[in-house]
Amino acid sequence: MKLGIVGLPNVGKSTLFNSITKAGAECANYPFCTIEPNVGVVPVPDERLDVLAKMYNPQKITHAVIEFVDIAGLVKGASKGEGLGNKFLSHIRETDAICEVVRCFEDSNVVHVDGNVNPVRDIETINLELIFADIETVNKRLDKARKNLKADKKYQEEIDVLEKIKENLEKGISARAINFNEDEKAIVKDMFLLTTKPILYIANVSEEQLQDAENDKLVNEVKEYAKKENAEVIPLCVKIEEDLSTLEDDDKKEMLEALGLEESGLDKVIKRSYDLLGLMSFLTAGEPEVRAWTIKKGTKAPQAAGKIHSDIERGFIRAEVVSYKDLVEQGNMLAAKEKGLVRSEGKEYIMQDGDIVLFKFNV
């Protein structure tokens, strides 16, 4: 699953990407420094693995991962091919969700592509380009569906949905903010529209702003805008995150405490991105390895087993499941079994986040 980091030029995208992935992507104070997208595979912070590691003393700890893509800065007119518009739109089309970085800090040394700091205007610049691209997609689909309608009346339903989307897009409303019934959702899913992708806004603030981000005027303007799409906003200072990313764990913890922060902004971004993609983790634990496995929310036990090996899914018999909370409270698996907290679940069991599982199978 890919999450695209987008934003106008010079808002801190590549610095954020470097900090998340420690990949050292080129970062410069001029537009379009990122042309081909940089890609980084990032571990998802999960303190549960550390707790289980103390319990099992494994040879190996393996975190779940997600993929971040740093996409070239977008400018007004991208949907018409301005700047790196066509490349930007094709790269974003390949992602599953969007992390939109928006500048909320003043700094005369960092050029703003539009001359001054106005986060809502910047968000609208990007979102309008995505909307324009989607209008073009919808118009093409409408033309095709109307031609096909003459031969097959089933296309009327698709036309109705397309017209509903077009009407909203032309009012500046992203497709993700439209209410669709289940039948409509199935049609929309097949359209691969840019504005249906889930979105997370990252407000890049100064160190001073971060100390009182809850009351910051610009951050709150972004939050008000995000409410329209039921989107979340994470304020962070990319400069601080860049410094934190170079530190060892103990030094990082010390710096966070000095700043009055419980966790880094990057950890919040990674965790929320994982959630935004509709993902969760089940866990396996033993002496060889303690591991988090990535599945979509709503996945049933046999399909979860298939993430470990296709043979386990094929020969699935049952899953022995205990919740992370119950295991930790009891202290070990034997005590959890004695209390009747380890359950035997069948093929229809829907996995829950933090389930610790042993799959039984036969092939």
Where are these regions (language model features)?
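Amphipathic alpha-helical transducer elements in NTP-driven molecular machines
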Residues: F32, D46-L49, T62-F68, E82-T95, ...
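Short, surface-exposed secondary-structure boundary micro-motifs
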Residues: R103, F361-N362
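Structural motif
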Residues: Q352-V357
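Conserved metal-binding segment of the jelly-roll/cupin
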Residues: D70, F359-K360
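Conserved Switch II/interswitch segment of TRAFAC-class P-loop GTPases
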Residues: G40-P45, A72-E82, R93-Y155, N168-N181, ...
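Conserved G1/Walker A P-loop phosphate-binding module
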Residues: M1-V111, V138-K140
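Glycine-rich, flexible loop/turn motifs
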Residues: A23-P31, N38-G40, R48-V51, K80, ...
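C-terminal-of-GTPase-core extension/linker across diverse P-loop GTPases
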Residues: K2-V6, F17, K144-I350, N362-V363
